[in-house]
Amino acid sequence: MTRPADPSPDRRVAVEIAVQDAASARTARASGADRVELCSALAATGGVTPSIGLVEAVVAVGLPVHVLIRPRPGGFVHDADERAVMLRDVRAALAAGAAGVVSGGLTADGRVDQDLLARLVDATGDAAFTFHRAIDAVDDRLAALDALLAAGVGRVLTSGGAVRAGDGVAALADLVARADGRLEIQAGGGVTVEAIPALVRAGVDAIHLSARRRMVAARVGPGGGEAAHDVADGEVVAAAVAAAREAGGRVRRGALPNGEGTDPRDTVG
């Protein structure tokens, strides 16, 4: 099914903020974000599954919450024990009020783990399922996207295989074209406010960023880990939302400079 024409004057690009606490979720809401992805240990591990107590606290903030389901750091190939934990965590997160989950896995030879994916999608039911950045570790992203489409996945979070999504614009545009409105492409991975216009021109449906700043701990000691943690910066969130709205409107109206409102791949160096 192709994406229906957007009847609005502007193309609406959603902004999702990666958060690790309820205060950051409140910041995201106050600054205009559309939803949050909730995880733990983002900077240290790339993100792992948060506690159910934290899920409940963030759900209470009022924004749609999409919970990362990843049992450990260190890649995306999961054994039987980890798969069982992931399925339990999906059910627990949804029972705690999450709007959806963010998860997935790969086979050892670098393809989408379709058996695990089918189980995760089934456990998610009618809630939203986003395939996470494991897609950036596959050998063939377009083939991986086809596997996600076949499994009924609704959204994928990707940098286009680049370290930073802003450097993966051409690949993201290819994914958008391949998806053809059947699945949302959400750009994420090192996203800065300055990169957002180019990402919107690539045709992505949503922008994902942490918009974080460092908070130095008041007191630490042996065994306490790093002496700082990350929280959402309201000014950065607001700037990202404004950039996405402005770029979406300009793409719709064909007002971007240098012909940049046409084919996004034409402007990629």
Question: For each of these PLM feature ranges, what is it?
Answer:
Residues 47-73, 112-134, 167-192, 228-254:
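Alpha-helix-loop-beta-strand connector modules within alpha/beta enzyme cores
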Residues 35-57, 71-78, 101-113, 160, ...:
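Glycine-rich, proline-tolerant flexible connector loops at the mouths of alpha/beta enzymes
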Residues 13-19, 36-38, 65-69, 101-103, ...:
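Hydrophobic faces of well-ordered beta-strands that scaffold small-molecule active sites
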Residues 29-30, 55-66, 91-96, 120-124, ...:
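Acidic (Asp/Glu)-rich catalytic clusters
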Residues 9-21, 69-85, 130-141:
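Active-site mouth loops of central-metabolism enzymes
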Residues 100-112, 134-175, 211-231:
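Glycine/Thr-rich beta-alpha phosphate-binding loop at enzyme active sites
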Residues 1-18, 22, 60, 252-254, ...:
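N-terminal amphipathic alpha-helix/helix-capping segment at the start of soluble metabolic enzymes
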Residues 23-27, 77-92, 136-151, 187, ...:
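Catalytic cores of alpha/beta
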